[in-house]
Amino acid sequence: MVAINYAALHAASWLINRINQVNVYFHAATDIITSAANSKNGWDVKFNGIPSYAVNMTDDLIRQLQHRPKASTEFINGAPNVTEGKLYEFGEGVGYRSSRCRSGFWPPGPGCPHSKTRHLVFPLAPEVDPIQRGSVPLGPIGLFVNGVAMYGFKDAFTYRNLATWERLAPEFERFDMDLCEGHADASGRYHHHHFSPCLSRQLEEDSSPDSAHAKIYGWVNDGFPLYGPHHGNKSLAISCWQKRDYSSSLTGCSDGQRSCIFNNNGDISLGTYSVPSLLMGPSTNDNLTSLSSNIIPAESGVFYQDFYFNSSCADQGGVYLNYHNGHSHDDFGFHYHITVDKELHPVFPYLIGPKFYGVVKSSDPVSMYSHQSRFQSL
């Protein structure tokens, strides 16, 4: 087994604000505030959660905004107020009608980003969990290298609130994300559930050779690193979690509906169990409604229970990832990968999961908060 110098990886990966860069819309410093390896508990990170993102308004982004299903009511003038070629700082308005985030940078969502001083300590000798008991929780599961919180794939809601069919945040919150594919929760903590093109640009992944292995995008609470989408050799890392075909005898249910759930979606040979009619999921031909009143097609892939792990896929090795959405190769040791398709659309489980590979002694180790500054409109 390759010995990994986690202290060296931490030292090289965090984006530290050494020039006191300030976001004028938050009146707060951006990215990591301080970072030090000399903590008795591990790698010590202090940050405020406000990234130094900037978005170049391209024609593609303008069309994306214009074609939002509720553009006529979401934007103050019925359309985005943007200029092609302009660089928009994180928080600078694009015309959204938002009662809470006054700048108009964010579509309607759970909350407005706040700047908060926060402190985390990551273990420098991560331990593999031999019994894989650490399920990915709601809320933070780690930290991206620019101080943005890393969240798992769930959105805290279930179909009809019956605690059976768990909704996936990247599906049901797809219209609640900003141009950097992030948003804030009700407490004001800005976070990503999946790949962020803005973080990729910040890490200068666009300029990396096609054959290069991705850089570290963040650190998971179990102490293992999360790398970007590329495995190397011009190839993406590939998730082996696959969507159920409800009409198939192998992965579906006898009636072709969401009437059964795998006993263990990590091992489909263990079969399924039928759910009572009250707990059946929607037909894959139905439409559902998000919290922001957008229509979400109920096709397979919008609930956690729509997925199963294909061990034969993972057994191929190389670019194919294990149950935890990670692998070990060359001199990297075990690491997770962000998963996307060729168009950089997020692919389940997006970051990690559904269980941590390593031992998590706390879901949010050594965390301290003090309110600094709420988003302000200048």
Question: What do these predicted ranges mean?
Answer:
Residues 2-171:
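Solvent-exposed N-terminal domain segments of exported/luminal and surface proteins
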Residues 100-104, 167-179, 311-324:
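Short linear interaction motifs
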Residues 115, 185-187, 329-334:
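Extracellular interaction modules
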Residues 121, 191-193, 337:
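Residues within well-ordered beta-strands of beta-sheet-rich folds
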Residues 130, 198-203, 342-350:
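Short loop/beta submotifs within extracellular cysteine-rich repeat domains
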Residues 132-224, 230-233:
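Extracellular-facing segments of soluble proteins and assemblies that are Gly/Ser/Thr-biased and enriched
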Residues 224, 229, 233-378:
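Extended, compositionally biased non-globular segments
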